[in-house]
């Protein structure tokens, strides 16, 4: 059992380089090291977790963002299209080459400590309310809006466009 380990890719796995590496408490360090080397050797980026957690890291981060996105729809703050643009034309562009911690570290002259000092209470106040059932938001018209924007009968076209854009972004990132 010392060789048991989880290697969790992110969709679409043929393009996204990140692969979460999740050793069990009984997994040997040698196994973890070998798996990371194999993952790296095929052009992927291993993300080593210190311990297993439901959803691992990528799904949990995505889930946190989606929880607030569903809440914004529920509260009538903006449309799904505006939320998608907030990511694709805002956070996503920046986060594609620098993660959230690097971003906030650079957003305050004093780095992350200054950022936390300035904004911690504001962010804590923003998220006291997050107790939302995502399915209740679907009933408020979210699904209809998304189906108008992204007709699932054209899913293959959207996936091809996504893959082309990701490929270009990845190629761009490797050049700099």
What are these regions (language model features)?
Residues 1-51, 55, 59:
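Rossmann-fold dinucleotide-binding core
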Residues 13, 64, 107:
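Residue-level signal for short amphipathic helical patches enriched in basic/charged
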Residues 58, 62-68:
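Structural/interface elements that position substrates and couple domains in central-metabolism enzymes
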Residues 33, 44, 74-176:
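NAD(P)-dependent Rossmann-like dehydrogenase/reductase catalytic/cofactor-binding core
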Residues 2, 26, 30, 64, ...:
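Charged, alpha-helix-enriched surfaces in structured cytosolic catalytic cores
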Residues 38, 71-72:
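Residues within well-ordered alpha helices
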Residues 52, 71, 89:
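Short, flexible helix-loop junctions that flank or precede catalytic/ligand sites
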């Amino acid at each position: 059992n010392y060789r048991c380990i989880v290697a969790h890719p992110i969709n679409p796995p043929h393009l996204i380089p990140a692969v979460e590496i999740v050793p069990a408490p009984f997994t040997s360090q040698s196994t973890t090291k070998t798996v990371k080397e194999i993952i790296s050797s095929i052009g992927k980026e291993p993300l080593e977790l210190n311990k297993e957690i439901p959803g691992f890291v990528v799904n949990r981060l995505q889930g946190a963002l989606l929880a607030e996105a569903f809440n914004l729809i529920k509260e009538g703050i903006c449309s799904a299209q505006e939320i998608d643009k907030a990511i694709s034309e805002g956070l996503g562009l920046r986060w594609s080459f620098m993660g959230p911690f690097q971003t906030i570290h650079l957003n305050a002259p004093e780095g992350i400590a200054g950022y936390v000092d300035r904004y911690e209470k504001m962010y804590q106040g923003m998220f006291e309310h997050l107790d939302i059932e995502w399915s209740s938001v679907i009933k408020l018209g979210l699904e209809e809006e998304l189906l108008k924007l992204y007709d699932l009968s054209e899913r293959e076209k959207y996936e091809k466009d996504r893959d082309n854009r990701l490929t270009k972004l990845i190629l761009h990132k490797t050049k700099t």
